[in-house]
């Protein structure tokens, strides 16, 4: 079974082809990704209308590229999958329209996929895939969640952010520091030259008996420190503040993940989403989990960002597990707001 997957939830257009033979782990045959970072950089953030227009321009050329790299024809595709939500409504509509139009032209079934489920399952494309059950730390864009995962489609929410997500804390702090877009990677790069102990920043909810997160107070503390520094400050204090900010976010993510592992008595942790590519987070999680005999699994770094491979993979795993049915009516809708915990089994 060949599954063609489309991702268009925000500012990346992703297309991928996955092979899912009966009883075997899905294999990624080819994938292509176009990032809109350069286009949105001048605006300091994603402009939804521009994002939608660019998805229209990129979807079919990327599809041709993927098929050529895989040595397959469009007629070889058995199922077409797309990101149904959550995300930007216009961007989601572009991806779903392209996917459903292709499926209708080919007379193939189509399947809508939850964006966060794609991230959650993406480590199954790595050379060292996890086994169920496990705890998942999802740190993607506006989402920060801890989930217990007992199988495909079997997810229980353990904790989530009550305000800003970790990715938003990175991006908003970077903006306060006058760094470029996207802010998270820029802050992480600057943090390499700073002293994380130079500023005492808060770790909200860290010592509370909860697996929920809160990063709004940290953002406020960073703003306060930036105002104290004033304009024209030299680079070192900015690097120190970047390092302290990253240290605060990472400490919360690591300690909450360990608490979730203790609460569930599980020995496997999956970390997925864009923030999962952060080197400081990976190194500290690896060290903390190694002391406790916990296995940690990540996606390949290139698959931490939004991509079509994770959508095609999630579709393959859902179909193999009997947790979804691809449909042939080719009508489509999108879910810009769609909690993963509310994901219904069998809803295309």
UniProtKB/Swiss-Prot annotation:
> What cofactors does this protein use?
Fe(2+)
MF terms from GO for this chain are: iron ion binding; N(6)-L-threonylcarbamoyladenine synthase activity
One GO BP: tRNA threonylcarbamoyladenosine modification
Catalytic activity from the UniProt record: L-threonylcarbamoyladenylate + adenosine(37) in tRNA = N(6)-L-threonylcarbamoyladenosine(37) in tRNA + AMP + H(+)
Binding locations of substrate? 138-142, 171, 184, 278
Task: Name the SUPFAM superfamilies on file.
Answer: Actin-like ATPase domain
- Top-level division of the source organism's lineage: Bacteria
**Localisation per UniProt entry:** Cytoplasm
Chain segments annotated as coiled-coil in the UniProt record: none
- Annotated residues that bind Fe cation are located at 115, 119, 306
Q: Which residues form the signal peptide?
A: none
Primary localization: cytoplasm
Cofactor binding notes: Binds 1 Fe(2+) ion per subunit.
Record key words, sorted:
Acyltransferase, Cytoplasm, Iron, Metal-binding, Transferase, tRNA processing
| A Pfam family hit | TsaD
Q: What are the EC numbers?
A: 2.3.1.234
Tell me which GO cellular component terms the UniProt record holds: cytoplasm
Record's keyword annotation contains Hydrolase: no
Q: What's this protein's family per the entry?
A: Belongs to the KAE1 / TsaD family.
NCBIfam families named in the record? gcp_kae1, T6A_TsaD_YgjD
This molecule's function is given as:
Required for the formation of a threonylcarbamoyl group on adenosine at position 37 (t(6)A37) in tRNAs that read codons beginning with adenine. Is involved in the transfer of the threonylcarbamoyl moiety of threonylcarbamoyl-AMP (TC-AMP) to the N6 group of A37, together with TsaE and TsaB. TsaD likely plays a direct catalytic role in this reaction.
Q: What is this protein called?
A: tRNA N6-adenosine threonylcarbamoyltransferase
Origin species, per record, is Methylibium petroleiphilum (strain ATCC BAA-1232 / LMG 22953 / PM1)
